[in-house]
A protein has these predicted regions:
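Hydrophobic transmembrane alpha-helices and immediately adjacent juxtamembrane helices
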Residues: 1-273
Length: 273
């Protein structure tokens, strides 16, 4: 029984790694894809960095809170690029009309999800890591100085991005390429409510409970507490983790239901450009 279980785990790992290798080869063979991973994070960081530098030299509060803009930009990019990296990898299969083949192969849906989660981290790392060093060189802002807090920020943001990316991929699978724009735009719907650049208290009182239902809100509040007050708030990270567990489970459940619906309606073989 144990040998059979080990064999099944090994087979599953091989299928996941094969899917990861496919997307790694796509990245490695296309310099425009690699350039796109770095271009927008760099533009955002430089633009907001210079704005933050200007404000910091002209306002007492922002002089005390220097770095919150750059920190918010870098953390937002983790959230946005994590979701986009997952969704783009999924769309690559749609564009190539390969999704039907994948769903009829021995690769299971949860293995497909795991492979796309890992490749989204690879995509994010290729784009975000160089930008963090540019932030040090241009503005003296060292994201890695957050220490263990950065690990908590990163994992919470990634779990949110995966949950949303998984669910959006299911919607695209079920509804076709007409829903493709969701992959590019859905995170911007959350941007005002997650309070990326300002405290939750800035929102109207009736919107604040909604903001606190979103895990990234806790991360950005935690970042501001760390930068401004020099205090790490583990309570915020635990709250975000609990919400992420619910959100991630809902995202996976929704994806599996949408896959079943797509199979029933025959939309798996109708995807593509």
């Amino acid at each position: 029984m144990s040998r059979r279980h080990n064999s099944a785990v090994a087979s599953s790992a091989r299928r996941v790694s094969a899917m990861m290798l496919r997307h790694w080869y796509l990245l490695r063979s296309s310099w425009p894809r690699l350039l796109d991973l770095i271009y927008w994070p760099t533009v955002q960081m430089v633009t907001w960095g210079f704005l933050q530098y200007y404000i910091a030299t002209n306002a007492g509060f922002f002089a005390r809170a220097g770095g919150t803009f750059i920190g918010a930009v870098l953390l937002w990019d983790i959230l946005f690029r994590g979701q986009l990296g997952f969704s783009i990898s999924f769309l690559e299969e749609m564009y190539s009309r390969n999704l039907g083949n994948i769903m009829m192969s021995p690769l299971r849906p949860f293995e497909f999800i795991i492979a796309l989660m890992v490749i989204s981290v690879v995509r994010l790392s290729l784009g975000a890591v160089p930008v963090t060093f540019l932030a040090i060189a241009f503005f003296g802002f060292n994201l890695y100085a957050f220490g263990l807090a950065l690990v908590a920020f990163f994992f919470n943001l990634m779990f949110t991005s995966w949950a949303i990316g998984i669910f959006v991929s299911g919607l695209i699978l079920r509804n076709g390429m007409g829903a493709e724009n969701l992959a590019w735009s859905i995170m911007f719907l959350f941007m005002p409510l997650t309070c990326v650049y300002y405290p939750v208290a800035t929102l109207p009182a009736w919107l604040q409970p909604v903001a606190w239902l979103l895990p990234p809100t806790y991360v950005f509040e935690g970042m501001r507490a760390l930068v401004i007050d020099k205090v790490f708030r583990p309570d915020l990270m635990l709250d975000a983790l609990a919400l992420n567990a619910v959100l991630f489970a809902a995202g996976v459940f929704g994806f599996l239901q949408l896959v079943r619906s797509a199979r029933r309606h025959g939309s798996l073989m109708q995807s593509g450009e």
